[in-house]
Amino acid sequence: MDKSESTSAGRNRRRRPRRGSRSASSSADANFRVLSQQLSRLNKTLAAGRPTINHPTFVGSERCRPGYTFTSITLRPPKIDRGSYYGKRLLLPDSVTEYDKKLVSRVQIRVNPLPKFDSTVWVTVRKVLASSDLSVAAISAMFADGASPVLVYQYAASGVQTNNKLLCDLSAMRADIGDMRKYAILVYSKDDALETDELVLHVDIEHQRIPTSRVLPV
């Protein structure tokens, strides 16, 4: 072998990549992608367990349907005797009811226990007759007929039980904002007397967009 051939062979040897270096790099990239995906899933899981700024006792949020927004009202049930009932019609603010033909897609109830709460309540939303006075007998019958989903909320040592919300889909009924006065939130205090300072109900009505927010609290 002459000198030029030896030099060429030397250059070729120097250019040859180190064995396994490329595959090791690809493997590291793949491992990094897997780790990133795992961290992303972990962050989402942890976020579901953290309070939010706007709703400190509730976690996460659900985005409204395209073209929809929501209006929230707050209900504070008065004292309810053991085994008795409370009902309140959904009365929206005038600034919302002026758009009475805007369709309503969902109604969501979020139960917020106050520090003294240590009992069990049943909560639901029902369409009621305009003539109904929401008497104890009338509300009792509506809970008993099984015609609507019921959220059973009970005391949780952590302060808020995991399933603290009830979401009712009204889109198939073509209900509108003007129809909301025909619906009522019903509460049954099953085991104990419920005091006025023990429970707050946040009711979110998702409807076609008017100038408000765009995220539905959960």
Curated annotation (Swiss-Prot):
Coiled coil: none annotated. The keyword Acetylation applies. The keyword Acetylation applies. Residues 1-10 have a biased composition (Low complexity). GO terms for cellular component: ribonucleoprotein complex; T=3 icosahedral viral capsid; viral nucleocapsid. Transmembrane segments: none annotated. The modification N-acetylmethionine is found at residue 1. InterPro entries: Cucumovirus_coat, Cucumovirus_coat_Asu_sf. Signal peptide: none annotated. Capsid protein. Probably binds RNA and plays a role in packaging. This is Capsid protein. It comes from Cucumber mosaic virus (strain M).
